[in-house]
Amino acid sequence: MDASKPLAPYDATTGWTHREASHLLSRAQFGFTPAELDRATNEGMDATLTRLTEVQPESTDFSRAETSLRQAAISTGSIDNLKIWWLYRMRYSANPLTEKLTLFWHNHFATSNAKVNSVPYMLRQNELIRTNAAGDFKQLLHSMSRDTAMLIWLDGNANRKRHPNENFAREIMELFALGVGNYTERDIQEAARAFTGWHVRDGQFWKHELQHDESAKTVFGKTGPFDGNDIVNLCLEQPSCPRFLATKLAKTFVCPEPSQDMINHLANRIHHHDLQMRPVLRELFTSQWFYQLENRQILIKSPLELVLGSLQTLVEPIRWTGVIKVLADLGQNIFEPPSVKGWEGGRLWITSSSLLQRANLATELTTTNQFGPLSETVRHVTTDGSEAIVNVLGRWLLSDSVDDTIRQELLKFHASAEGTADQKLRGLLQLILSLPEYQLH
């Protein structure tokens, strides 16, 4: 990698195989089917990135099923039905990067139905995020500041002229736009006054003029009769904003401990693109930095990445009710993040309890039909010999990342296993899904 140009394009003409395709798909979406891996390998990096970053039309079958699930969530008021609707989108949408980014921002603007207690409000927020997921962060931040679920979550109705509530002002600076250390307590106090009167009425944003403080406030060294919109704009103008976003993007999509130099380079690109995410993401996913060998198989899969990635590759059709439960057991209950900080992820995904649950997941996926049957594509590999089976499963599930010692153990296991071809395949799959290497991407 050219140290002077760390985000220089990766030369895919000399190094694009199923390994690079697998790396991209595992980071930019929730895993892949064998057919998707073949397509990305054959089409190349540029065509694959265009398909991922540009909006693709959804199929008629997808739209029909998605609409039905959405209506079921609304009519029943069931948060579990809303979870099934979103999981279905994550698995079957023609725009998987959009869904991955919707989860990224759901975690960034972490809002829990445990307090909001409204499927329509949570649905509206999710669709608002999706609309702006790969677009203009400025618009997204403005939209979230007026979002009904967010205002309930951070006590907007309690923010009144005589008794300002600092919750939203604090979180927009600490968690949404700037990060710790880039504001003062006085900035928060003054900004809270600017958001007074930003309430919810009849399920909609309502600026309660009688409860809004119209007097002058001083935030980030600037003084004026600011309202909430002005505070959002002031946050977006701070030089720490692109850097804050760069850090989160790098840790989510590239490596757990990016260097300060790399963060600075990425922040400069975010600033260059005026906080527009789509061109930034394309540069990131085509960069030498992204494809460096040391940045592959280094991120711990979140429960969603682990579960959906496994289902994408192995199972069809999927039974969603069991998926909701296992995600909650593994610690990633969508629409119900643990706090305003969201899921911190990384090494925190791995505990003695979660390791046992991940091992149980491998067993349930391969020895029961709790989540659905093995797909026809997967079952078909039983017609091959042990070496061919290990090779194809290694390509689909491990990106050929394991060393030869582990590969030989897998070969030995399959060759010596007793039972039918299907039983031997399931045993091998269970072993692969239990490997430490499978917990990484």
Can you say where each PLM-predicted feature lies in the sequence?
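Flexible, low-complexity segments enriched for small/polar residues
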Residues: 2-18, 22-33, 238, 242, ...
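Active-site substrate-binding loop specific to GH73 endo-beta-N-acetylglucosaminidase modules
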Residues: 2-9, 82-86, 118-327, 439
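N-terminal accessory alpha/beta regions
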Residues: 20, 27-132
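Short amphipathic alpha-helical interface patches used for protein-protein assembly/oligomerization
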Residues: 36, 152-156, 409
